[in-house]
């Protein structure tokens, strides 16, 4: 049930499959949830600005049922994105959403 959605104005990069897998493994590790439940989304070339500039930037959404640790996860995912895409950490926003189990559907039902 953990989900990470990364949107960036950076053009499609070589190694996007590797980045998806890195994000998936990092999210599973950060939440303690099985990677078999993790979903990753990666959207390149999104028209976006940060601080009035269209220099490389990113917006990340992380959603899960409980077990979010925003301070640690913010550092971890900013470092991963900086290393993979070269986006400075001060040009990345991350939104965290602790979703109620009754509001997360999968396999024709909800988790709660």
Where are these regions (language model features)?
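Interaction-mediating elements
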Residues: 1-112
């Amino acid at each position: 049930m953990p989900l990470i959605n990364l949107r960036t104005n950076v053009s499609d990069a070589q190694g996007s499959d590797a980045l998806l897998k890195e994000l998936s493994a990092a999210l599973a590790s950060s939440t303690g949830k099985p990677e078999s439940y993790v979903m990753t989304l990666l959207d390149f070339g999104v028209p976006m600005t940060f601080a009035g500039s269209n220099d490389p930037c990113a917006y990340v959404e992380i959603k899960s049922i409980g077990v979010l640790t925003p301070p640690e996860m913010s550092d971890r995912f900013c470092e991963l994105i900086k290393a993979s895409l070269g986006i400075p950490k001060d040009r990345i926003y991350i939104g965290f959403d602790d979703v109620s189990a009754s509001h997360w559907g999968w396999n024709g039902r909800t988790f709660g």
